[in-house]
Amino acid sequence: LTDRDFTRALWQSATECPVVFPEGVGVCPWMVPGGADIAMATSELMKKYQAAIWAQHGLFASGPDFDITFGLAHTIEKSAEIYVKVLSMGGGLIRQTITDDDLRAIAHDFGVQLNEEFLD
């Protein structure tokens, strides 16, 4: 699972995602929780992102205050839930997503700069 693939799945699942985390979400591979290795890997991801997913463990999010950080975490969680539900109802297929052109239109209208590395 890559930062790009995970971010695209979230962005394509809920309209507010590209507005709330236009830089994307980092993905940390599975590591023993609570140790120095996961702390160092997370700190590297946080140089680029406001949030990092810990594979098979959880989410780390950072922001200027509690409300913004909680909103970020909630948006990621909600979008992931939508993605999982759509996959489970569609037999593993996703039949409709927010296109890259639509993502760019959202970014334009909300005045945010998307991470273009994550778009086709």
Q: Would you name each region that the model predicts?
A:
Residues 1-120:
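Glycine-rich flexible loops
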